[in-house]
Amino acid sequence: MGVPYPGQSELVKRKAVASNRLKFNCDYYTQSAEYHKNKKHKFESKKYPGNKFDSNWEVKVYEFCKDHNIPVEYSPDISYPYEYDGKTCTYQPDFLINGKVFEVKGDYFFRINESTGKEEMFCPYRRKEWTEDEYEWRCGRYEAKHRCMIANDVIILRGKDINNLTIEMFA
């Protein structure tokens, strides 16, 4: 193999990605819904302990809703199927707030597509071992997920929204 550890081998890496795509419908276990539901390194609300969140922004939204007696459920039992690359994928939203579905996303997940002039979601993480085709595949999947959100009337909260939360946003 020519590498100190088997996990460093390109062949082993590609087999692992192929296996994860079959089992979890993503390249790495850490991208799977199972991982995010069970991972240890989550954020927690000091004001309302009990839930573990994926980001400080999600904590902020949850605390705002609780502080203002707005019905809120984190990681609700809701999922939306979408197609990408000939496979059915599943999107699970962050919140059900007052009967509406919300997703919290950083601004760094979005860019303007130069050829269409439209905003799209893309993969902001780029690993050196990915080929250009692999990276573009990931970006395409992010945008397919974004289109799924739009098609299902999911409200996307971004930086400007998180920093200016109002009761009216959740009415």
What is each residue range found by the language model?
Residues M1-A171:
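Nucleic-acid endo/exonuclease domains
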